[in-house]
Amino acid sequence: MVHLETRRRLAGLLFAVGLVPACVGGRGALVSPGVPAHGPDERADLVVARDGSGDFRTIQEALDALPPDAPGTRIILLRNGTYREKIFITKSRVALVGEDRDRTRIISSELRSEWRRTHPDDWGAAVVNVGDGVEDLVLANLTIHNDYGSRGGSHDHQFAVRSGKGTTRISVLHANVIADGGDTISLWNNASGMYYHASSSFEGYVDFFCPRGWSYVTDSRFFGHGTSASIWHDGSTDEDQKLVIQSSRFDGVPGFALGRITRDGQFYLLDCTFSAAMADRPIYLAREPETFRWGLRAYFWSCHRDGAEFPWFADNLQQANGAPRAEQIDARWTFAGQWDPEATLPAVLPFASIPVPRNGARAVPAEGSSLRWIGARKAGAYDVRFGRTDPPPIVARVEGTAYEPGPLVPGTTYFWRVDAVTPAGSVKGFVWRFVTGGPEGGTGSNASKANG
């Protein structure tokens, strides 16, 4: 396993230089004798803990300790605490995973304009800086916050996460990504970047969610603290590039605008809800674009606003290139089949995640549908609960990450939950739901593909 090899290399290095169990770089001290950094069932490669109970006290030293590359994902587990540090990720196939989404916090203060006064580029302007060429990065179960605005007063551009050229297959799972200014999460490989986000929360000011390339978001929350725009997209290098947001919620200060572009961009919003605070302002062109070959493209399906609806987010998928049906649109479709994160992401979270059918899916086939999920990090088996009631009853214990429910009743709402069975006990999952197609469920607005 990858984590065992990493530990062997690390242990060998420390023994060779006489640092067992002495300190490495002061604050990056190894654990004292008799204090286990890893529980017997822990599958993380390295553990970071501010109190000294892990392999390292700082995230950066753990990142630096990893070998340059590996065939599989290296998991760095961050114990609960506030890590006030700026981190630099230059290695591929890495997962930074918090112990608890709200209690594991990476925080730094940096205003982009101040950084650029003394630096030639943005490398170092973010809390989490992702180096050029990094692939297969996972940020999960933690909070990342650039708090410059609350400390320094300006709400201008301040990155929480930024990546650049050649970065791709970056996933944000069950995380809070916050900035007290604009450009909160800036994944900026405009040539080939592919980014996946699930069950996360994003906050900031202008253009706080602003991917370049291909980006997919599901079951997430957006909160805009400014009125200019929440989402932005750069799809200027390939007509197929798109930002797809599904089953997500938008909120913000009174009069917040949904989105804008300053160059070619393409938006798909399906099964999204907007608070009554959203302004009656369609996604708009902010200025004369730097490039504008395909125009502003914004497509909606079954989106609703609290209170009055606005005509500009009426269903119009039929106007998109190829006239895709709602049930076709998922992560794999977004990435044109080049990446299927909902089938291939590593098991890094402490609980089962990323359900297929997705949470809230409609028109799921009553015949031939299977349930699948991404596994939990420590799980050896899973207790599957499934039925027409919430909470659903337990129906099976399985060793894999799929369950065949058999024929389903058309037009019916089903609930399901997957609890991870670990050596330390059971980790309760979330309750998910879907509706089968048929006489009552139908196959119209809100339809969602059942099997990726």
Q: What is the predicted function of each stretch?
A:
Residues 410, 423-439:
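Extracellular fibronectin type III
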Residues 379-392:
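Extracellular low-complexity, O-glycosylation-prone stalks/linkers
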Residues 368-378:
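Conserved aromatic anchor
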Residues 394-399:
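Short beta-strand segments within Ig-like beta-sandwich modules, predominantly Fibronectin type-III
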Residues 30-350:
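Sequence-level preference for short, compositionally simple segments enriched
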Residues 406-413:
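Surface-exposed, short loops/turns at beta-strand junctions within beta-sandwich domains
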Residues 2-17:
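N-terminal secretory signal peptides and thylakoid transit peptides that target proteins
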